[in-house]
Amino acid sequence: MYAIIETGGKQYRVQEGDTLFVEKLDANQGDIVTIDSVLAVSKDGNLTVGAPMVAGAKVEAKVLEQGKAKKIIIFKYKPKKDYRRKQGHRQPYTKLVIEKINA
């Protein structure tokens, strides 16, 4: 059994027990979050596709950690003009483990 969910503007194919990194969610470590935006569910070989969401389907996930990804460096410059800008960015993420798929 698997489901296709949407969170943070991205879509993920998940099964029970999967671990995934998603865009930061407003939840504490150890909390259970419910994801209602389920686009499709496959159960016993039958695929149910929503229009746009599957009615009554939910995915429950546990928050393992909140963190920041590796730092990326943004460096802009204009040659011969003495213009240089260096900026760093670390994208926040939430690490989830899928507990249950209700369909």
Curated annotation (Swiss-Prot):
Entry keyword 4Fe-4S: no
GO cellular component, one term: ribonucleoprotein complex
GO molecular function: rRNA binding; structural constituent of ribosome
InterPro entries: bL21-like, bL21-like_sf, Ribosomal_bL21, Ribosomal_bL21_CS
One of the protein's GO biological processes: translation
Keyword annotations of the record: Ribonucleoprotein, Ribosomal protein, RNA-binding, rRNA-binding
Claim: Ubl conjugation is one of the keywords in the record: no
Pfam families: Ribosomal_L21p
Record-linked PANTHER family: 50S RIBOSOMAL PROTEIN L21 (PTHR21349), LARGE RIBOSOMAL SUBUNIT PROTEIN BL21M (PTHR21349:SF0)
Family: Belongs to the bacterial ribosomal protein bL21 family.
Self-association and partners: Part of the 50S ribosomal subunit. Contacts protein L20.
Function: This protein binds to 23S rRNA in the presence of protein L20.
Protein name in UniProt: Large ribosomal subunit protein bL21
Species name: Alkaliphilus oremlandii (strain OhILAs)
Gene name for this UniProt entry: rplU
